[in-house]
A protein has these predicted regions:
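Insoluble glucan recognition modules
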Residues: 1-6, 13-17, 24-354
């Protein structure tokens, strides 16, 4: 007598691509499987969604050989319901916003600067907000770990993923900013009252208190200048991150593949005007220009001594801002990169490829 065992999901009918088939050795009258084996087969071979109960069919086929007549094989099948050990799932193929607080189900994207961070900025009305997640064909919800859906405005909230939604209560209409950190399992929602603001810089031209004082909001347009631009001024539009308007991202792919490299600084303006729109003039009768502007660049060697530093590709480095002569004459040697990211809140710079 020879025995063959088969294991499969109940509805697979012991298909050739799904069944676990074993031809048992002589004298073997039992078959066991470890929890790890069943879990791996469920996930990889049978594509059972994580944390879903499923039913297995186990079949034994006994075949008789060597007698004077043919004997039909005996077949016995039993069914077993398996409840997997619960796995703490926190991943996503797609993240959206839904609920009565938003006009329609809206997919939200990862930020360019941080692949673990989803961000969204837009209009919400009074109502309930949910965060549905699609993962391996199943729908889950990102919910507060403590089950409390009250808006904790601007605060970090620990979250988890469940099959049942818990809604955040949006108490007033307006533009909200929502951040989901998939690595730290935290959500932060900013209302209009607590929302992050763009950087605004107030300075005296050239840093001399006797020169006019100006205020420049940093909304995305910067002026590149240095050997890398041929000592000409390049007006470049950086895109404020959805996560924080003080994170400015230049994506070469959105600018016909144009990449800026070489020694350069990032100035706030190339010219200055008064309240009537007239150019601000120096004592020599010439207008103030980019060379007198506040700029972002590498740290100077000292408060009075400039320097030039190579910016390593793929490494977050220190960004310095100022208007002194030492700062205005210091330059980062920027490598060719797909992305150039200036974090003005934390004063860092990163050039990296996608």
């Amino acid at each position: 007598v020879s025995y063959t065992t088969k294991l499969d999901l109940l509805n697979n009918n012991f298909g050739s691509s799904t069944a676990i088939v074993t031809s048992e050795d002589d004298g073997i009258f039992s078959r066991s499987y470890t929890s790890e084996q069943i879990n791996n087969w469920a996930n990889e071979r049978w594509k059972v969604p994580v944390n879903k109960t499923f039913t297995l069919a186990f079949r034994v086929i006994a075949e008789y050989a060597g007698g004077p007549t043919y004997e039909m094989p005996e077949v016995r099948t039993v069914e077993v319901t398996v409840t997997p050990i619960k796995v703490d799932v926190f991943d996503a193929d797609k993240v959206s916003l839904s609920g009565t607080a938003i006009s329609s189900v809206t997919e939200i994207e990862k930020t360019v600067e941080n692949a673990n961070l989803y961000a969204w900025y837009g209009e919400l009305s009074i109502g309930e907000l949910q965060i549905p997640v699609e993962l391996e064909g199943q729908t889950y919800y990102i919910v507060p770990s403590d089950g409390n859906g009250a808006l904790r405005d601007g605060e970090l909230v620990d979250v988890k993923m469940t099959e049942t939604p818990v809604s955040w209560n949006i108490p007033s209409a307006g533009n909200y900013r929502l951040l989901i950190d998939m690595e730290k399992k935290q959500v932060r929602i900013y209302s209009p009252a607590t929302d992050l603001k763009p950087l605004s810089v107030t300075f005296h031209l050239t840093g001399d208190a006797s020169n006019p004082e100006v205020t420049i909001p940093v909304t995305g347009v910067l002026y590149l200048y240095g050997a890398g631009t041929g000592w000409g001024t390049k007006e470049v539009t950086f895109e404020p991150s959805m996560a924080d308007p003080q994170i400015l991202v230049y994506d070469a792919a959105k600018h016909n593949g144009t990449k800026y490299k070489g020694k350069m600084k990032f100035a706030l303006a190339k010219g200055f005007t008064d309240s009537e729109g007239k150019p601000l003039m120096q004592s020599n009768g010439k207008p103030f220009d980019l060379s007198h502007s506040y700029c972002f660049t590498c740290p100077p060697k000292t408060d009075t001594e400039k320097q030039e530093i190579s910016l390593p590709l793929g490494k977050v480095s220190e960004l310095h801002g100022g208007v002194s002569s030492a700062v205005r004459n210091s330059y980062y040697d920027v490598p060719s990169a797909d992305l150039l990211i200036l974090d003005l809140r934390n004063m860092t710079i990163l050039a990296r490829n996608k």
